């Protein structure tokens, strides 16, 4: 898979005329809210190509958590967001994107600067510097800045500072260096009223993302397809979980998709870019458990997915270290039975629970239990008519631990880990649609 992506990247270089422009490097940011998450996402993005006609979304939480290609029904819209990013972090990584000469770049950054206490003048200077570098490295790229949403997550003092940033950047943009889009006007009141967010505006729900996508559709050049969803979900799940489910339920229900189901390991992967075929959708939710996936499989009703690729179970043990492997298998069994009943024509691939590395605080005893569940998953494939994929062995070292090179924090995957996983999925016809009915039989023999 990595070799395939290298070929894509090489092609991008040829298409852009071997851009030789360079600028003095930007210093690495002096602070991170989540160092390992930044390393994970930045490392993965560094391996993914961008093409001349691509639209690239760069920036903070709002960008990272959006499924932009699905909002507009266009796989050329690329997500390069990293949750917790501030203007320093975007500035640090913008050159790599700009050198590949995308058609458009959208930047959302500044909220985390305010939360960190960064001065107004510094934020404004960083935004100007971002677009100055883009204009020098890729003069033909159209640039857009999505201004700071002055939501309740900010103190009154921070809101006042944010208003000054927005005003200064709006005035500067009149010079033509980039267009400033007033997304604050589209989102602020809906967030304050609890329609677009349930946590004060750090996260957006389906209605919030619908409003945001609508606010920038003219600049994107395509109509937004995601519809408002502001239904609240059970309080016993995390804020992130509720907002993510709401966003997923707001997306167009298209038939015949290959659906990636699971927890953060699935959630954090750019599946449409790893397999740029236009019909793979990411339905992972960070923190999800087997029963959580079970409770949301109804969202695919009427869509007749071609395939489900399921990977979950990690958080069952994280949330309850005393739970037995047999109990987790029973949860899997119930989920698999219902998938088979509700989606009888959908191919089901059940992937092993991945091991952890000693760097993880949940490492003690985890790998042994995960291995027990994996044996039961393997043993049940013929009874319940699914393909079992042993991804765990591919990313494990001689001790059965997650390889150091496959992880940043001992539990989540690095770019190397995702490439190994993707290479296994790429074998044969697994990631192709509408296959011969003998496929499942062939896989299990």
Predicted regions and their residues:
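N-terminal secretory targeting modules
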Residues: 1-58, 68-69, 100, 171-174, ...
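Conserved beta-strand scaffold positions in the cores of enzyme catalytic domains, especially
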Residues: 57, 77-79, 180, 260, ...
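Oxyanion-hole/transition-state-stabilizing segment in secreted/luminal serine hydrolases
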Residues: 58, 63-76, 87-124, 148-152, ...
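Second-shell loop/turn segments in exported
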Residues: 79-83, 112-120, 153-157, 198-203, ...
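Charged helix-capping and loop-helix junction motifs
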Residues: 120-130, 159-166, 325-333, 366-374
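Hydrophobic positions in alpha-helices of CheY-like receiver
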Residues: 130-134, 335-339
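A short helix->loop->beta-strand "cap" motif at the edges of active sites that frequently abuts
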Residues: 138-142, 343-347
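Catalytic His-Asp segment of secreted/periplasmic serine-dependent ester chemistry enzymes
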Residues: 150-232, 355-445
């Amino acid at each position: 898979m990595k070799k395939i992506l290298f070929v894509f990247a090489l092609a991008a270089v040829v298409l852009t005329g071997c851009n030789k422009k360079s600028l003095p490097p930007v210093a690495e940011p002096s602070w991170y809210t989540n160092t390992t998450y930044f390393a994970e996402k930045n490392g993965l993005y560094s391996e993914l190509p961008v093409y001349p006609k691509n639209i690239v979304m760069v920036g903070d939480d709002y960008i990272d958590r959006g499924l932009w290609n699905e909002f507009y029904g266009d796989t050329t819209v690329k997500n390069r967001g990293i949750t917790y990013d501030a203007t320093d972090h975007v500035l640090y990584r913008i050159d790599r994107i700009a050198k590949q000469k995308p058609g458009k770049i959208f930047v959302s950054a500044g909220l985390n600067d305010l939360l960190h206490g960064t001065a107004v003048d510094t934020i404004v200077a960083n935004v100007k510097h971002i677009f100055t570098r883009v204009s020098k490295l890729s003069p033909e790229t159209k640039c857009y800045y999505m201004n700071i949403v002055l939501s309740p997550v900010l103190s009154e003092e921070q809101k006042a500072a944010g208003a000054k940033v927005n005003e200064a950047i709006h005035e500067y943009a009149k010079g033509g260096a980039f267009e400033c889009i007033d997304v604050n006007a589209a989102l602020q009141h809906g967030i304050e009223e609890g329609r677009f967010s349930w946590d004060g505006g750090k996260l957006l729900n389906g209605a919030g993302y619908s409003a945001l996508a609508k606010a920038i559709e003219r600049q994107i050049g395509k109509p937004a397809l995601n519809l408002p969803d502001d239904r609240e979900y059970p309080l016993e799940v995390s804020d992130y979980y509720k907002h993510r489910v709401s966003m997923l339920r707001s997306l167009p229900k298209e038939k015949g998709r290959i659906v990636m189901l699971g927890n953060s390991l699935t959630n954090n992967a750019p599946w449409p870019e790893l397999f740029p075929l236009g019909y793979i959708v990411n339905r992972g939710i960070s923190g999800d458990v087997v029963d959580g996936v079970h409770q949301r499989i109804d969202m695919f009703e009427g869509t007749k997915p071609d395939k489900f690729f399921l990977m979950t179970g990690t958080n069952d043990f994280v949330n309850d270290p005393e739970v037995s492997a047999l109990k987790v298998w029973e949860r899997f069994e119930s989920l698999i039975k219902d998938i088979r009943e509700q989606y009888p024509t959908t191919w089901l691939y059940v992937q092993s629970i991945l091991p952890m590395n000693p760097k993880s605080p949940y490492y003690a005893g985890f790998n042994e239990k995960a291995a027990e569940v994996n044996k039961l998953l393997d043993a049940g494939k013929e009874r319940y008519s699914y393909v079992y994929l042993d991804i765990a062995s591919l990313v494990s070292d001689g001790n059965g631990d997650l390889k150091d090179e496959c992880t940043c924090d001992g539990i989540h995957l690095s770019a190397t880990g995702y490439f190994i996983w993707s290479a296994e999925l790429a074998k044969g016809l697994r990631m192709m649609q509408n296959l011969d009915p003998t496929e499942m039989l062939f896989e299990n023999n």
